[in-house]
Amino acid sequence: MAELELVCVPTRILTDNDDIVDAIVEFGGHNIGPEDIVCVAESVVAIRQGRFTRPEELDVCWQARLINRFIHPDGSMASIYGMQSAMNLDGKWKVLGAFILGAIAKIFRKPGVFYAIARAASLTDDVTGTMPPFDKHIVFGPKDPDKVAEKIVSRTGCYGAVVADVNDLKRSAILGTSRGIDAKKIAQLLIDNPFGNDSQMTPIVIIKNYASVSGK
């Protein structure tokens, strides 16, 4: 009987000059079958889309400096530059309002309100949050992740595809899926972060035999 297996796909360094679907076919195509789910790290998708900047290119406002004082050092907004990037994308007053509402919500034991409102903050990888040479950059969330997932399915013939945001702190979120894929189920399968966005260079993971094991 087939069993689920997570296969990490090694690549070279992928940049904004690469097409992520081409890279998946080149490095993992030989191992992708019609019952498999192809998972790709959101930071690599965003880098390919040119959605990154360097900290020195940002003009940090007082709102970003203020809010950053209250952000946990392990969070995606650990630096003032990451916070400023989120403000540039969402608007500084929206992010400030989200912070105030989030602080009030925490009093009533309801966490996560800030990141639910300020979506750019939850999707931004701060400096050192991704693989070299982009570890000196701030990487924004990917654009149209559902469309990216659909392109992967169309090109590879796999059962499904997802764009995933996973870290070593047991945070697993699916930002985009192809049609018919249960994002919560895939997020749980990736909870231990099989991706290697640093020196491992394995930003692609194949969930083998997913369709048959899940009874699809």
Each model region followed by its residue ranges:
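N-terminal and secondary-structure boundary signal
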Residues: 1-216
